[in-house]
């Protein structure tokens, strides 16, 4: 069984005439545009350590818990992600992600609250909660995308 040993928290945004190209630019802006993302549910493995640099070759498969949103002219959007690590490094942590086109101020608060609840339900003490978010505003005819992710490898 494979368990990731490293994780990184990222957010980014991108703009294009095409929705998928805007998403690709958001991935590139977040620093994960040259990897093949496999979307996973929201568990951070025990002993998984934060790493500032992704040490994989371009094209590598990388696991990601992420939220994304794409908007058009006149819309606003936000993505947010949070990861809670346990005081006991033998216990797994949790990851929560969300996106919204409405409650832009609440996304980071929401993911933090979900982390707190999930760790409490598991009877785990929280060492720390790390968050990242991306707000976007579409003022032209272009599509704008945002992503917030916890990537693991």
PLM segments and residue spans:
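Helix-coil modules at protein/domain termini and other flexible surface or pore-lining loops
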Residues: 1-153
